[in-house]
Amino acid sequence: MSFEPTDSAAAKAGNPSNPQRLPTALQADLAAAFPQLERGETRDGTTWLRVAMPQLIDLATWVKARGFVRFLDCTVVDEPSRADRFELNYLLYSMAEHCWLRLKARSLGEAPSMTSLFAAADWYEREVFDLFGVCFVGHPNLRRILLPDDFEGPAPLRRDVPIGSEPVDFTVTRELYGT
């Protein structure tokens, strides 16, 4: 049996499974500062903001200055039928407000790096680069993180890459793993 606090005091105490909604004052400030934003909420109440790629860093800087200092994830949705096929998703968290915020921006395959704002973005952006081929401009160390350095071919998690298998030569030895 699990205990799920439901009152706001318990939620503000730090239970990430019971986040608060984006504060009304912050919503109004966002609308004034970024009138072109598209805004919505997920089923669990997480607010998402979609912005044009050129305004992404400005928006991220703005929300970071207002307490969204925890960078938790960078993911991508690949929709090959769209001209701007990649939708980058950045998940941020405010410990002061106890709420999540997802930033979204569409891309053709290139985006500004968030590493100058959030050091934690480093490896997430490298993973997206490696598996989807999205290039993060200004990233200090944009190199492969999961695939072999000599990997050739299309980025493997793109939806237009055919599903199948290719034999990969590797050997597991007792010396390697000490078993």
Segments and roles (model prediction):
Residues 1-179:
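Terminal low-complexity/charged segments
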